[in-house]
Each structure stands twice: as C-alpha cells, then as structure tokens.
C-alpha cells in the first residue's frame, strides 16, 4: 500500500494544484476499450524469443491501453483465446505479480498471484482497494510459429499498476448540484495520448453522465438528447492546438432542450470547469443547434463568466476563522480574538460548532455534564451575532455540518443522522431523520464525525477510525438518504479521529498515528501524509478550506498553509493557543 500511496499521490497532487482512448465522432457514450484508434508505439509487443514469464508481464502492461477492445493486449493471444476473452467491465489494478509455472516443451500452465491496488470501471472511475488477488484461474501458453502465445486466460482485465500510471491521467468532470449553486467533481481516469483529443473525450463523458452512484445526487445539464455535432476544435475551428495559448476551444452541440438562462449558465459551467481544470484554456465558444448558447457570449466564455459556480472557492470566505474557546464562540479579527455578539458569544459549554456556507448563520452543540452518565447535548441554530433556537437534543451530538440548502446535519447518539431545518410554514425548527441504513449495514458502529462536502452531495464520516464516504440522495418523497457507502484511504488504517473537506475532492483528517497525525485522502481513496513538523499530539478537531488547514492540539489551534513557502511547518494561531480551543470554519 505504501507504493500505492507514493505513486498515485503524484496524480492526486497534480489534480489539486491544477485545480477513454479516442475521439468519438458523435456524443454516444463509449466505454473503456470500445474506441478505435491506432495502437501507441510505446506499448510492448510480443517477440519470437520471449520467455513465457516475460510475455505474461508484457501482456499485463499492454492491457493498460483500452483502445479497440484492448487490441494491444490481444497481440499476445492466440486467435482462439482472443475470440474467447471477455474484456468488458471493470479492470483490477495489480502489483507484485508472481507467476507459478508448470512447463512442458510446447505448453506452459501458469497460476497468478498479485496484490490488488484498485479497480478501474468501464467509465474511468478509479477506486483504491487492498488485499490479495483471488485465484483467477489457470493461464495457459502454447508455442506457435511466432513464439509463445497465451491460449487460455480468465475473463476480465488485469492492469499492471506501473503501466496504468503511465497510460492513464486523472481528469475531473463537473456536474451541477441539486440547488444549482455550484458544480460537483467526478474524477475520471482517461487514456488519451493526443492532447487535441482530450477536450472531445471529456465533453463526451459529460454527455454520457455521472458515475452510477452519483446519478441521483447531481444534475446533468448535458443529458440526452443533447449531443456533440463533431469533435471539439479551437475557437476558430482549427483541429490542433485546442485549449493552448490563445486558441481556446469550441464545442458545437445539437438537440438542446434547455431554455431558461440559469440552466444554460449551469450547462456552460459544467463544460468550462471540466475543460479548465484539465488545463484546456478558453475562451470557450459554446454553440447549440447552430447558434451561441448565450448571445452575449458568442465570442466565447471565460471562467470569470461562471465564477459563481467555481468548485474551488472557499465557502463563506468573508466570515473568516472562528473558534470555540472556553466553551464560547469567538472570531478572529486582525489576529485578535473577540467573542461574537449574540447568543453564541454568551452560551457556555459549547463543544462543537459550524458556520453556515453563506457565513451568516451558526449551528452549535451545547453539552452539559460531558462524560458523565447523565450527559445531555442540544443543537442551537441562529444568525451569527443574533439569538439562537434549540433545534435538536440527545445524550450526545457530534459537530454539525451545513448543506447548501441551509439545513444543518448532525449525528445524535452515535448513529442517528438528522437534518435540522426551519419549517417554512410555522417558522419553527423541524428535525427530519436521514436514512442511513446503507451505511449502518455495510459499516456498523458509531459515527464519530460527519461532514458534508462543500457541494452537499457527499457525506464523509469517521466510523471505527476509518473514512467512509456516502452519497447524499434526495428521494422522490423529499426525504434524504446516505447511499453507496465506501471506504477511503486504506493506508490510513483505523487511525482517523476527525475530518474536514478541504475542497470538493479532498478530505483532510487527524489521526492517532503520532508519526503522521494529519493526512489527506481524495475521492479515489488515495491518501498522503501532511507535514508533521511543529505538531504536538493528540490532535482532535480539524477544519479546512482550500488554502489553510487548522487543527486542535493540546495547547491550542495550529494552522498549516501550503501557500506559505518559507514556513512549511505548522504555526500557532495567535489568540487561539488555549487548551481545548477548536477551529470553526464555514461548512
């Protein structure tokens, strides 16, 4: 797993700092392996003198290229084996492969052992995994006039890990959140060697829709019957230099059914952020049915034109940093700490809090008799600087989290997930249970932390010291459910204490691991360690935004900012070096 973290994090960091195979002639979705294009010259090919062991390893490398139903890999097979091999569906990424042979003069039978490092779905979704590869069945090689060839192999695709790293690149698709306020990341791995084909591939994937588990958590303004009229070109129609220099990109679509301006703006945002985050630069000329998507942007859109949906913006940035100090909420003002006006600055015994994503409201948990058998907790919600209303209670309540629709999510008594809202009819607080059956069934145990992503479509939880991710789905009846739970960050073990979303694709956690007390994990499940210089353990609460991470340590709150190159370690936050102080940010 250390190798997984070391190699994959290069892709992860590239995606954070920046922010499948071919060019389909139409917008019809094309799964991995079905696109036709020439086989890249750098892929291995079988040669007459190859030993069976070498030929098998080169075959695994060749499976990294999905084009033409894995044509590069099929060159290592006999005709009958190629006809019988089913390469559809997801692929397993494997490493540390060992072959055990039984050999005769004309035939070799092989069993394969390997470590599983992850999987790659047929739409390019990569997820980490761990464990030993179950016996896939025998592999048989026979000697032919051209040398050894594979004559029998199990169905499915096994990707060589190193070759996968060299062939596939991580890009992010963006879909609209249900409220229409922002866009939601959907990372994909694509194998496109020609940079001028990448824009078409990404827009085609947008048209094909989100990954299956996101189908009911996001909106896709590029859904059918909308389709591409042809490949994405330069803004002037040229076929080379797309998105480079001042060439821009031109997307021509047809069968547009969206008429209202806001939906068209969201449609443009999906395209623009998807291309911009792939370093395909504007201006972005977007046409539909032979006319500009919006007349005022006939000459092209820029990221500034869709800045309101920027997936990298910090929620409620104007609200700044707050903290709980001695049980009350304080604000940071020019490195001075002052109690906030109103109820949240007066109420004692506050143990967890969150500022709303607009920066105008607060949700705070008050805990009486903490640690005692008769411990009692209550959730209070109100305007920042105003009065508060009790919205939930229980034996214990975890740190609250705000959604984009201004609902407060909180875990009551270790495993009951609630949404606290203001009833639109009565104006009174309402507590609505969230269906967390899928989470409890797959990951039983107490929930120790729950935080919503900045777009509100995902929930990250700490259960049994592990990071568990689930989708936030609104049912037809208007209720909410946590769906498709899966584990992230196998390399973190069971050491996680608390978590916070740094971006929509990046979670930062505190851990009981004294050597690595703070780590990152992304939506693929890839984890890496943050610097630890200057940190004292144990660490408890953590709060983050795209630029800064704050943690609660034994002596108070510390901060780490990647932008401070001259000070790469953790630094004290002036005024918050008080034992028990905890950082509070919007979210």
From Swiss-Prot:
Its main location: membrane. InterPro entries: GerMN (IPR019606), Lipoprotein_LpqB (IPR023959), Lipoprotein_LpqB_C (IPR018910). Residues 1-19 form the signal peptide. It is found in: Cell membrane. Keywords: Cell membrane, Lipoprotein, Membrane, Palmitate, Signal. A lipid is attached at residue 20 (N-palmitoyl cysteine). One of its GO terms (cellular component) is plasma membrane. It is a lipid-anchor. SUPFAM superfamilies: Tricorn protease N-terminal domain. It comes from the Bacteria. Transmembrane segments: none annotated. A lipid is attached at residue 20 (S-diacylglycerol cysteine). Pfam families: Germane, Gmad1. HAMAP family: LpqB_lipoprot. Belongs to the LpqB lipoprotein family. This is Lipoprotein LpqB. It comes from Mycobacterium bovis (strain ATCC BAA-935 / AF2122/97).
């Amino acid at each position: 797993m250390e190798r997984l973290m070391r190699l994959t994090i290069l892709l992860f960091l590239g995606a954070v700092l920046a922010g499948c195979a071919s060019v389909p002639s139409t917008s019809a979705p094309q799964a991995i392996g079905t696109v036709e294009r020439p086989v890249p010259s750098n892929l291995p090919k079988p040669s007459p003198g190859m030993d069976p062991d070498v030929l098998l390893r080169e075959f695994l490398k060749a499976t990294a290229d999905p084009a033409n139903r894995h044509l590069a890999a099929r060159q290592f097979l006999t005709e009958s084996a190629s006809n019988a091999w089913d390469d559809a569906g997801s692929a397993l990424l494997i490493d540390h492969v060992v072959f055990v042979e039984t050999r005769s003069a004309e035939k070799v039978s092989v069993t394969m052992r390997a470590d599983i490092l992850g999987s790659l779905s047929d739409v390019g979704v990569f997820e980490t995994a761990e464990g030993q590869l179950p016996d896939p069945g025998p592999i048989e090689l026979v000697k032919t006039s051209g040398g050894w060839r594979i004559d029998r192999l199990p169905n499915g695709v096994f990707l060589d890990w190193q070759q996968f790293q060299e062939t596939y690149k991580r890009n992010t698709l963006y879909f609209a959140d249900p409220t229409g306020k922002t866009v939601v990341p959907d990372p994909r791995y694509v194998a496109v060697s020609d940079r001028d084909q990448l824009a078409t591939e990404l827009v085609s994937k947008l048209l094909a829709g989100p990954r299956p588990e996101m189908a009911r958590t996001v909106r896709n303004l590029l859904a059918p019957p909308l389709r591409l009229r042809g490949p994405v070109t330069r803004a002037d129609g040229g076929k080379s230099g797309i998105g480079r220099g001042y060439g821009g990109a031109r997307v021509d679509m047809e069968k547009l059914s969206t008429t209202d301006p806001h939906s068209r703006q969201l449609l443009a945002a999906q395209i623009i952020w998807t291309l911009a985050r792939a370093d395909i630069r504007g201006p972005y000329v977007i046409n539909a049915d032979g006319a500009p998507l919006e007349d005022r942007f006939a000459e092209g859109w820029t990221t500034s034109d869709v800045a309101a949906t920027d997936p990298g913006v910090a929620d409620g940035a104007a609200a700044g940093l707050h903290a709980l100090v001695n049980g009350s909420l304080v604000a940071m003002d020019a490195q001075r700490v002052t109690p906030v006006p109103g109820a949240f600055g007066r109420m004692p015994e506050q143990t967890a809090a969150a500022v709303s994503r607009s920066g105008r409201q607060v949700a705070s948990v008050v805990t009486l008799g903490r640690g005692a058998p008769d411990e009692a907790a209550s959730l209070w919600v109100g305007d920042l600087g105003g009065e508060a209303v009790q919205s939930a209670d229980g034996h214990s309540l975890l740190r609250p989290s705000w959604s984009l629709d201004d609902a407060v999510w909180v875990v009551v008594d270790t495993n009951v997930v609630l949404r606290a809202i203001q009833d639109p009819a009565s104006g009174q607080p309402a507590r609505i249970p969230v269906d967390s059956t899928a989470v409890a069934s797959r990951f039983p145990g107490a929930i120790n932390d729950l935080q919503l992503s900045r777009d509100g479509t995902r929930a990250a939880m700490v259960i049994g010291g592990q990071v568990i991710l689930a989708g936030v789905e609104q049912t037809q009846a208007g209720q909410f459910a946590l769906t498709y739970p899966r584990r992230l960050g196998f390399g973190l073990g069971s050491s996680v204490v608390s978590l916070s979303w740094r971006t929509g694709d990046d979670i930062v956690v505190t851990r009981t691991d004294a050597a690595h007390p703070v780590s990152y994990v992304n939506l693929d499940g890839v984890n890496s360690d943050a610097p630890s210089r200057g940190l004292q353990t144990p660490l408890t609460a953590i709060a983050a935004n795209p630029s800064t991470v704050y943690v609660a340590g034994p002596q108070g709150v510390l901060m780490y900012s990647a932008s401070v190159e001259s000070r790469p370690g953790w630094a004290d936050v002036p005024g918050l070096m008080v034992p028990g102080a905890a950082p509070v940010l919007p979210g």
